[in-house]
Each structure stands twice: as structure tokens, then as C-alpha cells.
From Swiss-Prot:
<feature type="short sequence motif" description="Nuclear localization signal">
    <location>
        <begin position="203"/>
        <end position="216"/>
    </location>
</feature>
<keyword id="KW-1195">Viral transcription</keyword>
<feature type="region of interest" description="Promoter-binding site">
    <location>
        <begin position="249"/>
        <end position="256"/>
    </location>
</feature>
<keyword id="KW-1191">Eukaryotic host transcription shutoff by virus</keyword>
<comment type="similarity">
    <text>Belongs to the influenza viruses polymerase PB1 family.</text>
</comment>
<keyword id="KW-0945">Host-virus interaction</keyword>
<keyword id="KW-0696">RNA-directed RNA polymerase</keyword>
<dbReference type="GO" id="GO:0039694">
    <property type="term" value="P:viral RNA genome replication"/>
</dbReference>
<keyword id="KW-1035">Host cytoplasm</keyword>
<dbReference type="GO" id="GO:0003968">
    <property type="term" value="F:RNA-directed RNA polymerase activity"/>
</dbReference>
<protein>
    <recommendedName>
        <fullName>RNA-directed RNA polymerase catalytic subunit</fullName>
        <ecNumber>2.7.7.48</ecNumber>
    </recommendedName>
</protein>
<dbReference type="GO" id="GO:0030430">
    <property type="term" value="C:host cell cytoplasm"/>
</dbReference>
<keyword id="KW-1262">Eukaryotic host gene expression shutoff by virus</keyword>
<dbReference type="Pfam" id="PF00602">
    <property type="entry name" value="Flu_PB1"/>
</dbReference>
<dbReference type="GO" id="GO:0003723">
    <property type="term" value="F:RNA binding"/>
</dbReference>
<comment type="subunit">
    <text>Influenza RNA polymerase is composed of three subunits: PB1, PB2 and PA. Interacts (via N-terminus) with PA (via C-terminus). Interacts (via C-terminus) with PB2 (via N-terminus); this interaction is essential for transcription initiation. Interacts (via C-terminus) with human PKP2 (via N-terminus); the interaction competitively inhibits the interaction between the RNA polymerase subunits PB1 and PB2.</text>
</comment>
<dbReference type="GO" id="GO:0042025">
    <property type="term" value="C:host cell nucleus"/>
</dbReference>
Amino acid sequence: MDVNPTLLFLKVPAQNAISTTFPYTGDPPYSHGTGTGYTMDTVNRTHQYSERGRWTTNTETGALQLNPIDGPLPEDHEPSGYAQTDCVLEAMAFLEESHPGIFENSCIETMEVVQQTRVDKLTQGRQTYDWTLNRNQPAATALANTIEVFRSNGLTANESGRLIDFLKDVMESMNKEEMGITTHFQRKRRVRDNMTKKMVTQRTIGKRKQRLNKRSYLIRALTLNTMTKDAERGKLKRRAIATPGMQIRGFVYFVETLARSICEKLEQSGLPVGGNEKKAKLANVVRKMMTNSQDTELSFTITGDNTKWNENQNPRMFLAMITYMTRNQPEWFRNVLSIAPIMFSNKMARLGKGYMFESKSMKLRTQIPAEMLASIDLKYFNDSTRKKIEKIRPLLIEGTASLSPGMMMGMFNMLSTVLGVSILNLGQKRYTKTTYWWDGLQSSDDFALIVNAPNHEGIQAGVDRFYRTCKLLGINMSKKKSYINRTGTFEFTSFFYRYGFVANFSMELPSFGVSGINESADMSIGVTVIKNNMINNDLGPATAQMALQLFIKDYRYTYRCHRGDTQIQTRRSFEIKKLWEQTRSKAGLLVSDGGPNLYNIRNLHIPEVCLKWELMDEDYQGRLCNPLNPFVSHKEIESMNNAVMMPAHGPAKNMEYDAVATTHSWIPKRNRSILNTSQRGILEDEQMYQRCCNLFEKFFPSSSYRRPVGISSMVEAMVSRARIDARIDFESGRIKKEEFTEIMKICSTIEELRRQK
């Protein structure tokens, strides 16, 4: 039967059909090859927006730098980064006037955080530029390598375990005349395999010592590595994103802590909240503007878009903001917070892997690393690439490009939001001193502006004033991409507002389906996603029921676990049929063991094992959940696990789901091929960290786990904890005297070994 698609929408208000226009079904586009071109684009564009600034040379690194601050005021509508310091400071002062004590209180909160944060805060996050190896690594490994190098160079403040002390080492390291580092390298040799008698390539990993002089070390410490942003939907061109090294991260973290604390107190800020809380905040601002625009006033809303938000932001401006916000605070605190923007005004962008050349006729491929772009003959490149390289050449040093203006994506989301809100704050009548006034919402580079005025001319005047104020602060509202509507219909951070928020269901589409973690987690995540969408995204009961049936079907095909009485033949059907026949209570079998599905939309909150527990045969229960069964996962599973969901836009979300350890919660093994590469040493390090951390968590379960403040090593902390716990257990009769003595003996042995070491 042919369905005319327009019929589907006859009864649906147009705004509810917005979902169908989003590019969120199917696989998102990924980038291949190097990100060098995209990074050069970013660097060149950023300099172009600030081209009328002042050029200077950094005395330490010799890098050319462009400073657009207080540059000429723009005369056209082209994007520009000429922020005016006095305007930014004035905007901050007015923000404080409207929110008395906001900066003061946030500083006090932040100071507390600064003194308590442990250095392991930096292990969060995924890929990080590891300056010791000059490439990306998992955050924990990059931090470990940095600390190891610091210690071997006599920097030991970090041993206290406090982040602030690690940062003291970072500052100290920048004054050193040279830094010794250990780098990994690979040797390949051809050897004959004893078994197959074939020639194979054997790789061995070597470590070698290398000394970096002050200049080279500074360049690495100020380097942001760049990659291409993957899985970005609805865009034709890819773009580059940056990952900073460990020297910068800690400082950025403290600045963002202060900015987050300020954003929490600002009603126009869309960060750091999300989801329903964000919608409530938004709805409040809209309500305020609509109630205040009585019959005499018009109210219009701009769905705003800024041109190249972070390429026109400037770290020097952030420094001015921080200097103002912390003006009555202790010297040490002001210094700690001002280092991040200072490092960013001297940052270097690493150009990535370089270019790949291939000759079709000779079947040759060769890589031109980024370091060579400064000297290579340009005749090998096509026109557009040649122009890029010519433009960027004066800025190149050791394979990195000097990039003083601009911010790179996602580094100071909170702080730049504060800047945006400070303009929205200026819309109050007492500041505009005329008949129009404005308010709105800001979330990083996204904004919605609500303007009220007695007539259309007033609205136009208000928008113009807002636009010009933005220009003074280095923010460029795009006239092409922003549009205006009667208040009541707008879009902000992909939330569509039409007299209330419309569920944009398509955004959730990518998270439906089977995740591919393991049978147990997948079942749990699948039903939780459906449950969450019924709560938050207008997923109706009939559709949810259908989604559930489709999910179960998908799940059975993925894990080849069709019901035991089905005719479908798969690799597993023989085993599953056998189990089905010898099970008395067939309803008790899990879906992944060929059992029936007992889920419906009323019981989605119950883990499948619990749902069927009473229906299971006893011996099945014993096999499924017996900790002595070697196939029951050996990692203890807390009652809640976290899955990382990739929503259609925005950062990966953490989603909690119930987890019950059974024979189905297996963890797949790592791919063997990594064990033959230069990553192997790194992998072993990573596993060692993992083991230490897991052990530590056993001693300090989260319920009783207050971060140890004070200077003791992990081992000392665990030993003293073991002694306390053992004494309590012994006195309350939970353990016997022999066990107690044995524990005490082990503790003493450990301490003895530590002393000998």
C-alpha cells in the first residue's frame, strides 16, 4: 500500500513535525585521513578575523602573535575579534550590579574547590595530548607520564596529590633550562617464524632519553593537538577540534569551576544545567517577557546564531574578565586563575599528521609530516592547499602553528557563557534608558534574544543596539542565520519552543537499539532508553509498546537468541532448544537464553533478572547468578552502571541503568593486535593503574569514601583502613580471632616491604 506522507501530518500541528526534518537517522558521517587541512583553515580564519590587530613576537618561543584587543571598531558586517577591554569590564560591572555579590561568592566557593581537588581530577576525559610522546593518549596515561617526567626532573610538589601542587610543578617546569623526557620508539626487524617458516615483521619497543631545551619544552607545554570532529550531522564540511595537554588542563579546570559557579547563579545561562531543568529555566524567561509585554507592547524573539564564536573570542579578554571578577581576592588565587588565559594567548596548534601523497602510476604512497610544511616545495600541492600553506608559514614552529587569538572549541564554555549573559543583562530598562528592553538565554555560543518594545521601530532599534553591543565584545551575531518571530516560537540549543517545548524526538533516535556491550547491559539499556523517552520526550504508550517489540526483535537477532520454540535456525538454536526442553518454568528463561519477553511499558524499570527471578527453575538461578560460576563476570557490578549514550547533538550523555551481575555480563577481551605495537607498554601501564584504582575503591567504598585530604600514599591509606575495619569486624564478632591476627600480620608485612623499598 502506498502512503502519501503528507497524510501523516494532517492531524499534527506543524511544529510537532519538526523532528522529521532532523538528519538523525542512519549513520553519522565520520572523517578519514588527516585533520591537517581543517586545522590550517581554523588558524588562517582566526587570523583573518583579527587581521587589523598588532603583531608581536613571543620572546620565549619566537612565535609570531597577533593581538586584536582594542583594535579598530568594525565598519562592516564581517565577523571580527576586536573586543574592547573597557566595554567588557563595564559589562562585568553591570552584571555584578544586577547580581550583588555574585563574583565574591563564586570566588569563595572556587577557592574551597581549589584547595580540595585531587590531581586525579585530570584523569577524567578521553584523549589528551601527551607532550612527552608528542601524540594523543588516554587522559590517565598522559597524566602519569607527565608526573613521571616531572619527578625525574626533580619536581616533587605533586606528591601531595593535590591538583594545586601539581600546578606548582607545572609553573616551575616552565622556568627550567631543560627537561629530560623518556620517549617510546619502535624497531622493526624481519625474522623467520619458527612454526610457519615464513618471514614476519617483529616490532620491539624501545625507550630512549631525550633532553628538551626551554624553548622546545615551552612549545610543547603550550601545544593543543588537533583532530577532526567526528559524527557531526547536518554539516557538509568537517571541522577541527583541539585537545590540550596536561600543563593547561588543570588551570582551565579551575577557571571553568569559577565560571560554572557564576553561571549557576545567572537566570539567563543555559549552562551548566541540562534536560528538563534547562527547559524550566527557559520557560521562566519567556514567561517573564510575555507577562511584562502587556497589551501595549510587542514582543519578538530572535533564534540566534553567532558566526565563528570561538574564533573571535580572545583569551586576553578572558584574562580581563578574571582580573575583574577576582579583584578583592588573595593574590595566589588571582594568579592561579590568570594562568589559563595567559597560556591560551600563547598557544600553539599542532597541525596533526600532515598530508598523504600517492602516485597512481608508481603505486607509491608517502606521508608529508606537518613539520615539513615549513620548508617543502609547494609545487606538489593543489591551489587551495598551496594558499593555506603560504598563509600559515610565518606562524610555523616545529610542526605547530602559533595561534594567539581565538579559543579553540569547547575550552571555556562556561566563561564565554558569562560573557554572553553580560550582554543580555544590559537589556534591562534601567540600562537601555529608552522604550525597548531585552532579555534572553545564552548557552556557550547559542542564544535566544527576546526583545520587547511599544512598536516595530522599537524592536528594530533594540535588535540593532544588541547587535552593536555584541560587536564591542567580540561576538558576531550572524544576520544571515538568525531569524526573528513573534515571541512564543523559537529554537534554543535544539529545543523547539511553541507556547511550551515541543519534544524533538529525532534527537533521541540514535540511542534506540542494541548497544553492543553485552547481553545483560544491552537489555537493561534498551528498556531504560524507552522508559526515559516516555518520561522526557512525549513517547506515547502505543509507540513505546511498538518500540519495545522492535527492540526485543533487534536484540534477538543481534544475539541469535530467538525463543526456544521458534523455527528460526541460528548458530545458537541447538543449545537454546536443548535448554528450553529441559526447563520446567519456561517463563523464567532470560530473553538472551531463548526465553519469552515479559516486558511491557509498565515494568520497564525492573531489571530482567529481577522480573523473572520468581519464575526461574532453581538450578537455572544457581547457574545464572552464582559468583562461583566462572562465567559470571568477575567485576563487582554496583547496583547502577553508566552507559555512554551518543545523543544526536551535544556531548555524550551518561545514562544510568540497573545492572545485575549474571553469566551474561561478560566483558569482551582486548584485541590482540595491540599487544605487538608501541602501545603495549602504555596498555600495561593503563592496566596497572586500573588495578590500583580498583583495589583502592575496594577499601574505600563510595558510601564511606571521603577523599583523603592530607598527605598519605594510597598504600598507607589502605593499610590503615584495613586495620580499622578489621578491629571493628573482630570486636563485633563478624570475623574470628585467627582471621584478625592474619590481617594484622599482612598489614605489618606490607609496611615492612615499603620501608625496605
